[in-house]
Amino acid sequence: MYKRQTAECAGVDTVVIPEQNTAAINADALKTSAGALHNIPICRTWIIKLALQFIKESGIQLIACTEKTQNNMHELDYRIPTGIIMGSEEDGVSSELLKMCDAKAKIPMSGKIASLNVSVATGVILYEVIRQRN
């Protein structure tokens, strides 16, 4: 639920999450999200690919946040309607979903560890969106 709180604070319109392998949305989730679940629609779907296909067909660019690219996240344009794809902690964004994306964004890092946890990465890229839009 921590990502939902971050999404709400960043002004995200909607969060789309897979039905499988994600936390339940219940009273504990509401408490943990600091009320963010009251302010942002959550769409749970069994087939994430179909949801992303619909989003893309609706004119929203899809950008995957992944270390599997050379594109620095600061080089991409988030001023147009954008969907940010975040992967799982273990596997990242699947190759199937990467193919659907209009672009891939990498968070620049200076340390020896090549990745952040999903919660932190979500916050970093969402605040790049805010920076560009303001």
Where do the language-model regions lie?
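Post-transcriptional modification and biogenesis factors for structured RNAs
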Residues: K3-N134
